[in-house]
UniProtKB/Swiss-Prot annotation:
Keyword set, alphabetical order: Secreted, Signal, Toxin
Domain of life per record: Eukaryota
Predominant location: secreted
Leader sequence segment: 1-21
Protein name stated in the entry: U-scoloptoxin(21)-Sm3a
Record family assignment: Belongs to the scoloptoxin-21 family.
């Protein structure tokens, strides 16, 4: 009888923990927080952070053209090195 009760407790504990993990994942998804191991969500959050960083920076046309020319020069330099 004690063995059956112990097995039942272990089984119920497994179900409760599994449901709690699923609820936490749903909560994170609803809030837009990338969960552990969700590389797709993490990549999307990284891209959003980069976009926000760019939007908050000085994005005047003169500064953008300077930044683009620096990027082009760096790309040319790296391509010529390889």
């Amino acid at each position: 009888m004690k063995i059956i009760a112990l097995l039942l407790m272990v089984f119920l504990d497994f179900i409760i923990v599994n449901x709690a993990e699923q609820n936490e994942k749903k909560r994170r998804d609803n809030l837009g927080i990338p969960g552990a191991g969700d590389t797709e969500d993490a990549n999307q959050a990284y891209k959003i952070a980069q976009d926000l960083q760019y939007k908050n920076s000085d994005s005047s046309p003169g500064k953008r053209s300077i930044m683009l020319s620096k990027l082009k020069n760096n790309a040319k330099r790296q391509f010529s090195e390889n």
